[in-house]
Amino acid sequence: MALTLASLTLGAPTTAIPLWPGAAPGEKGGLPPEADTIKPTDNLVGGRTVAKIGNVSTPTLAFYPAPKDTATGTTVLVCPGGGYYILALDLEGTEVCTWLNSIGVDAVLLKYRVPRRAGREPSAAPLEDAQRAIGIIRQHATEWGVNPGRLGVLGFSAGGNLCAILSASAGRDYPRVDAADDYSFHPDFQLLIYPAYLVKEGGGTTVLPESAVTPATPPTFLVMAADDPIDATNVLAYGQALKQAKVPMELHVYPSGGHGYGLRPTKDEVTTWPARAADWLRARGLLTAP
């Protein structure tokens, strides 16, 4: 029997389910089959390879429930990075869901559409997928044991950019499909880990309009390394905008570590960020069951 939203039950993790009842908005087909595009020459991270999933035309979500005896009632939608070309689905996805479960947080892994669609903004299709995913989670909050008022997002690199754009969006970017689209898609908090594209590439110092910060932006946790080739100005400018808007935020810029480390430990202090993130969640009361 095919798995549907109605038949989804708690597991560790559940089987991935499609976000859309038919084709996703604007999809024209023609992509090769979805596949891991990893190459033998790719760099290792923390001594291990990184999955690089490409050609995603059927976006999905997979629910990773925290153990019942430690569950806090907090849920996080995880958005992997990959420049909007691929998804680092283990490094910045499944491994992150496992960590969130270890601190009592339910995780939902978003596999959004990549690569960039011709004739559209790089984030356009992924944003539709993220908006849809949040609506689905809130629609099924009771069935899945989710507190709809304690639902955040966590994104890496392009996934961090996606989270920021999601938080800034005024309305849905696609016509209503069903009841899931009647629920708010705005997250209650966000964690942006080495986010990309928040400022203009090549020297921008102010947050781009699509990621604009307002007093309605949710409380934010930011991490980056000073030697990140993406440029730490992304988090510095975003952090300053949060401060000016009086949005609660915590910003960590570490001396070294580069880009794309996920939460795998390395010699660089930046990879201790999960402990800082857990402290931040705890301080906000999100690691204590209501």
Question: Whereabouts are the PLM-identified features?
Answer:
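N-terminal cap/lid segment of alpha/beta-hydrolase-fold proteins
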Residues: A12-A71
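Short beta-strand element of the alpha/beta-hydrolase
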Residues: T72-G81
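Active-site glycine-rich loops that stabilize anionic/oxyanionic intermediates
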Residues: P80-Y85, A226
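Catalytic nucleophile-loop/oxyanion-hole region of alpha/beta-hydrolase
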Residues: L87-D90, E95-V96, L110-G145, R264-V270
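Short beta-strand/loop motif that positions the catalytic acidic residue
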Residues: L222-M224
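Conserved alpha/beta-hydrolase "acid-adjacent" motif
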Residues: P229-L236
